[in-house]
């Protein structure tokens, strides 16, 4: 079976670590260094049974049809934003991602850090230091105790955030239309009700056509005056123009963003001018431990697929029966 790896400049070093680990496992992948936006020669995919690609690669139906042997598309990260899930399922192709526990823990810890930083006015403090202004006469920090936290998305990371904060004397609310077995102590609400009643809102949803600009101007207006918005999930979940307007008008007290609609965040983005926003370059939660675990899981997932086993991190679960039948027929 053939394994093709597809990396771009920002991910090449990480993919080289995966390549070396695959080779140690007895798998010899073909590693293609790709420039985002460029077409991939059909010949490069002709013998691919498994395609290991960076998550925002545009893996369209056309790309998948160019690989007649293709059984699976694998992202070593959580994100599979660029993969056409519907087409993959229709073609009997498994879509697999990587989310080891180390990644979940790192993202949850980092989210709590962002919540605390925004609550305690760290962005304002940095702005004061950089501008040379005097220390404010009145504190901007507010205790987290006694606040209401709204968690949008109760997947692994959202649940871990809730678990980390369970004993912090805060009220936990959540919105997730697909949630099952909601942990004790969390009140499940419709999104608009959560926004109206939460002091801090943190996003943990996947980016789909349905969730793009989930937080738009209308929903920002629903949020409490002086509320805080946290996003460590996907930039496209928030309408950044509407967010700038909500913050510059004073409606929101603060925000902390690790992800953006365009990455890296353009230097002329108006968000950069706000003194009460914490911006980080899509690196929050990425630890040495999680990076090593992502490599190990990518190798394990590829190995499982090559042996005819669907990994636990299968994203399009409805493909399972078709996929196993395709495997049995070869």
Question: What are these regions, as identified by a protein language model?
Answer:
Residues 1-50, 169, 306, 322-330:
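N-terminal glycine-/charge-rich "phosphate-binding" loop or analogous flexible N-terminal tail
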Residues 1, 70, 145-148, 217, ...:
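Phosphate-coordination loops involved in phosphoryl transfer and adenosine-cofactor binding
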Residues 43-50, 68-71, 196-201, 224-227:
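Short acidic/histidine-rich motifs immediately flanking catalytic phosphotransfer sites
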Residues 59-62, 171-173, 177-270:
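Rossmann-like adenosine-cofactor binding region
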Residues 108-127, 166-170, 297-304, 309:
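Oxidoreductase and adenylate-handling cofactor-binding alpha/beta cores
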Residues 49-126:
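Phosphate/diphosphate ligand-binding glycine-rich loop within oxidoreductases
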Residues 96, 226-330:
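Rossmann-like dinucleotide-binding domain for NAD(H)/NADP(H)
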Residues 102, 125-160, 187, 323:
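Glycine-rich NAD(P)-binding loop of Rossmann-like domains
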């Amino acid at each position: 079976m053939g394994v093709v790896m597809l990396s771009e400049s920002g991910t090449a070093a990480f993919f080289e670590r995966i390549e070396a680990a695959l080779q140690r496992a007895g798998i010899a992948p073909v590693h293609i260094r790709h420039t985002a936006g460029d077409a991939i020669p059909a010949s490069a995919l002709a013998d691919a049974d498994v395609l290991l690609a960076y998550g925002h690669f545009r893996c369209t139906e056309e790309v998948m049809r160019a690989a007649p042997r293709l059984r699976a598309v694998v992202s070593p990260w959580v994100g599979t934003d660029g993969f056409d899930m519907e087409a993959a399922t229709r073609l009997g192709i498994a879509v697999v991602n990587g989310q080891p526990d180390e990644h979940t823990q790192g993202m949850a810890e980092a989210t709590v850090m962002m919540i605390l930083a925004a609550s305690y006015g760290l962005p304002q403090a940095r702005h004061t230091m950089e501008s040379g202004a005097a220390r404010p006469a009145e504190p901007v920090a507010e205790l987290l105790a006694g606040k209401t936290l709204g968690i949008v998305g109760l997947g692994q990371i959202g649940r871990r955030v809730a678990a980390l904060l369970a004993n912090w004397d805060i009220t936990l609310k959540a919105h997730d239309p697909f949630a099952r077995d909601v942990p004790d102590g969390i009140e499940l609400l419709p999104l608009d009700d959560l926004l109206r009643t939460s002091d801090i809102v943190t996003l943990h949803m996947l980016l789909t056509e349905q969730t793009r600009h989930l937080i738009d101007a209308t929903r920002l207006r629903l949020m409490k005056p002086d509320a805080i918005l946290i996003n460590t999930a996907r930039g496209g979940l928030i309408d950044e123009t509407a967010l700038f307007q909500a913050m510059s008008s004073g409606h929101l007290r603060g925000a902390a963003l690790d992800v953006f609609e365009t990455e890296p965040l353009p230097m002329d983005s108006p968000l950069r001018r706000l003194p009460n926003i914490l911006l980080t370059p899509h690196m929050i939660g990425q630890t040495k431990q999680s990076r090593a675990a992502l490599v190990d899981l990518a190798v394990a997932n590829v190995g499982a697929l090559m042996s005819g086993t669907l990994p636990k991190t299968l994203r399009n679960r409805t493909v399972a029966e078709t996929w196993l039948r395709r495997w049995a027929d070869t």
